[in-house]
Amino acid sequence: MASFYTSVERTAADILYVGYEGNRRVVEKVRFQPTLFIPTRNKSNYRTLDGVNVDTIQPGSMMDCRDFIRENEATNFRIYGNRDYIAQYISDRFPDGCEPDMSLVNVMFIDIEVQSDQGFPEPSLAQQPITAITVKSSNDDTFYTWGIGGFSPEISIVQDTRIEYKRCMDEHSLLKSFVSHYHNNIPDIVSGWNSEEFDMPYIVNRIARVLGEDQLRKLSLFGHKPELNKEGTMYKITGTTQLDFMKLFKKLGYTYGNQESYKLDNIANVVLGEKKLDYSEYSSLAALYRENHQKFIDYNIRDTQLVERMEEKTGFIALALTLAHKANSNYITSFGSVKIWDTYIYNVLRRRNIVISQPDPVHGDRRIEGAYVKQPLTGMHDWVCSFDLNSLYPHLIMQYNMSPETIADSVMPGVDVETLLTKNKFDVPKDHCLSSTGQLFRTDTHGIFPQIVEELYNERSVTKKKALSAMQDLEKISKDDIHQRFQVEKKISLYNNQQMAVKILMNSLYGAMSNKWFRYYDIRMAEAITISGQLTIRWAEQRINKYLNELLKTGNVDYVLAIDTDSLYVRLGDLVSKVMPDETDQDKICKFIDKVASQKIEPLLADAYEELKEYVNAYEQKMVMAREIIASRVVFTGKKRYIANVLNNEGVQYSSPKLKVTGIESVRSSTPQVCRQLIEKTLKLILNEDEFAVQAFIKQARDKFKGLPVEDVAFPRGVNNLWKKQKEGIGVPIHVRAARKYNHMVKEKNLNNKYETIQNGDKIKFTYLKMPNPAKQNVIAFPIILPNEFDLVRFVDYDMQFDKSYLEPIKNILDAIDWNVEKQNTLEDFFG
């Protein structure tokens, strides 16, 4: 029987609990009495992480606990235990954790439309009427929509949907009907696109203005009014969690890469290959509302549908829930690292009868030295192979037994990465290991942090095997057996979410440990991780260079052309030339390099890391370095900036080479999409053709570029500090200046009813203009389209746009390999 929580909050005296027992939703107000701990000389089952013997005490209610702590800490009497009483209550109720059943969780997707003929509708003011609302719950197959004009679901252009439309006389009746529906179907989770900072605060503020504040109580399972956050931008509705899908995408959608824009239209296209409903035949959304209400409502429904479909494909909401339940914490903590790790560690320690202490105040806030990034050997290199350390920071924690209770008080003087690389002899004390800062860690006991990381790794390995087994089972089930396939697919989804949750949790551990607000923050441990990481990667560099110099009988050649944190790039062109001087078959060369990597370099590195373990007296050897890519050609232009023509990646041989791009403008969200595409094509030419082919393509690209709409060639940017008082031209970012000019021209030409003005936080585009022009400046911005009424299209400086967005990044690469962007005239050309 499923038993799990969906929301746990508190008032001064009560815990407000929402969850499920079996198929039944449970809503409870609990008078909770927390447990604290105090030092004792008596025999006890409890101790702190640093060995203090403690025993339980229950002063009474949460308010009583607060008073008890204040009175006793004033006399320097130490009190232990978790003062986050929500976390303590969840742990009391679910000591062994719990798993969410997504078939029970009610997720409501929501989207609203607001009258926008007088500029952008500011949620905090909510001055303009709401003109449409659509909601779709995960436990109901119907889209419920409210509007003030005509709409026929039968002829809706939004396909594959069941729509129930409520036509209302006015906004008052619309909001009243919506509140009634919401009250009868209060969700566990509300989600939408930017719903946390727009849709929900606008709805709350508008209901208060139109229906009265008392109606807001109907939005909460506990009858509470929504609470505004400190910044005045978002509301908390007691009993319901808001998981804004835009924020989820930014947090969890890293596999989709950097985005030109985080507007729904772009992200839906990236994830689904689908877009918002196009209404470009109308001048604005306000015009669409006035002139085609049927399509206006379709537009509203479509937005809601897109977010729901993205969740169906990505499972980000399900993943956020799995991640939170992994730590026994509320869903909103899945967005961060400090809180979720604090709660996770608390639950692990609690199961071992280890009591947490209060964090000591942090004095000072000096910057932690980071990872090692080598200045690369710039230029073009043939036959490059990269090697990657597996999850470096978590494995360093395990290898050096780094944990709050294993940090030794002593530091060995004269220890740094350089001295360790020379293999100077250090007398490491017995039962200690030496980190690269000189900080010692005890090895006579297994640290809690390394234990936690190891358990997570083992758990993820088991879960991945379960997922693989379930996938194999699915292949054996007939496609006609829909019920059985559904059950197995549900298992696969569960296992995938579980293993991804563990991966995300592990990857966020160092982020928490290096944060001064983390309960277990200690700069000695945080810096020992990063600097020991520096030694680890440079240890590999040293060993690889020694091997290749001996093999190729070269003096002191640097074959490691680049290093970035946990990976290094080795140039093997000289080795290929020596062993296979006449070979032109790339597949054969690739197989040779793969053999060298797997049979020579990887075993060499394994031995090197075993030697390092003995040298620093590490708790255990956890460093594993494996071959990643084999590229026929690589061009480095600087740190973290390169392109590679990849033939094989982690053992997967590609049928045709794949382009890998890091740090180059083609993967930057600030580069226009059309230029990113042009840059990508050019990069492939650089890696596979010659200088003349690249020059011909650049010339052709410039000609085509000049025929594109301005909306395609303008720079995408996010705009902030729009209203910051700065003298024009002095310290004002160019895109902000462009946005101000756009707003000025909209007002100057009385176009407010047709075009929305740009607001702080908006994603915009801007372009250079030739002077003179009607705008009287050299740049103009716009949210979606450049208004024809501005009469500026004919002044767009296409040459400037082309040079800045396409040619300059390409020229940086060509300069690194001594190629020119256009053919250079020679004496032979001059004399014919």
Functional labels for PLM-detected ranges:
Residues M1-I186, I301-H325, I332-V373, L377-H381, ...:
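DnaQ-like (DEDDh/DEDDy) 3′-5′ exonuclease domain used for proofreading
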Residues S283-P404, D409-S410, K479-W539, R543, ...:
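Common nucleic-acid-contacting/processivity interface regions adjacent to the catalytic cores
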Residues D594, S598, E602-G832:
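C-terminal, non-catalytic extensions of nucleic-acid polymerases
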Residues K276, I537-T565:
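Active-site palm subdomain of RNA-directed nucleic acid polymerases
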Residues Q159-Y165, N184-I189, L288-K295, K326, ...:
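Glycine- and acidic
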Residues F143-T145, S152-S156, R162-Y165, M169, ...:
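Active-site-proximal helix-loop-helix substrate-binding element of RNase H-like nuclease domains
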Residues F178-Y202:
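Proline-aspartate-enriched helix->loop->beta-strand connector
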Residues L568-Q599:
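Catalytic palm subdomain of template-directed nucleic-acid polymerases
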